[in-house]
Design a protein with these regions (language model features):
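Residue(s) in the substrate-gating loop at a strand-loop-helix junction
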Residues: 189
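Conserved glycine-rich cofactor-binding loop
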Residues: 60-61
């Protein structure tokens, strides 16, 4: 054969498609096909039934309870905590387990206590294997002049509102980094953006949460973890029911939307953040009806 014909033959051989032997009519081939189909269908069913997990602090009432209801309705297993109103939290958990076919863990403790946070996160991971969404919602307020505060009041507000966010993030992040996936949503306030007279400590904590959110979003973005915050305006919760009807009416008049926000609206936005594009990161989303 000439050199040209050898080259032509070689070219044809190199482009011939590779074909697997046909084992479909053999016993081993049938077993292999059946095994593959079983594996594929089992994996498909496992993916269909696999639920995500959300850990929500301050979940017994108000925004926290609305968050729990929304994520439960979307099929999330839940880990919920509160400091007071534990019976209310348990009743909520029972209701959600029954109506949404999910599992709920309830914890009672002070989110300002680092040991409590460590135990809660570990038990949640032991039970569910992962925490897909962390929502830092727990918070307390102090209304009064700064000069009337003592150091105990200040430390308690900072521990509950700000240090707790560090604590939960510190404990949850390693598992999210390992999974290369996760959402951290911090419930903040417009007072963190502009400050409020007679709520200095609360404003300082919320401002700290906003800065933490922006910085941590940058830090965790390479690990495909999104960190965002919701800066709430006036939401109709127990925290704002200290106002008289006259004060509430005057406050509502200042809000372009003409009403207070609802806890369910906060929960809806939080769920949107938990399912948003990974490119949305380190942002503070204001939910205030156009108020600030």
């Amino acid at each position: 054969a000439t050199s040209a014909s050898r080259t032509q033959r070689s070219t044809k051989l190199s482009h011939a498609p590779f074909q697997l032997p046909n084992y479909s009519n053999t016993f081993s081939g049938v077993c292999l096909v059946n095994f593959f189909n079983l594996w594929y269908n089992t994996k498909k069913e496992w993916r269909r039934t696999m639920k995500h997990t959300a850990l929500i602090t301050g979940a017994s009432r108000g925004i926290g309870a609305a968050l729990a209801c929304r994520f439960a309705a979307e099929g999330y297993h839940l880990a919920l905590c509160c400091h007071n109103s534990y019976e209310t939290l348990q009743a909520l958990a029972t209701k959600l387990e029954t109506t949404c076919s999910i599992q709920v863990l309830c914890f009672r403790g002070d989110v300002g206590d680092y040991t409590f946070i460590c135990d809660m996160v570990q038990k949640t991971l032991d039970t569910f294997g992962q925490i897909d969404v962390l929502i830092n919602n727990a918070g307390i307020s102090y209304i009064g002049l700064l000069t009337d505060m003592d150091i105990t009041d200040w430390n308690q507000i900072v521990a509950t509102n700000l240090t707790s966010v560090f604590s939960t993030c510190r404990q949850v992040i390693p598992s999210m980094v390992h999974a290369k996936s996760g959402h951290i949503i911090n419930i903040s306030s417009v007072w963190g953006n502009v400050g409020a007279s007679c709520e200095v400590a609360y404003s300082a904590c919320k401002g700290g949460i906003n800065s933490l959110t922006r910085a941590l979003g940058k830090e965790l973005a390479p690990s495909n973890i999104q960190v965002n915050a919701i800066a709430c305006g006036v939401i109709d919760t127990d925290m704002n029911r200290c106002f008289s009807e006259e004060e509430r009416s005057a406050l509502i008049e200042e809000i372009p939307a003409g009403r207070m926000g609802s806890p369910e609206e906060v929960a809806s936005l939080a769920y949107s953040l938990a399912t948003a594009s990974s490119y949305l990161n380190g942002q503070i989303l204001t939910l205030d009806g156009g108020w600030i």
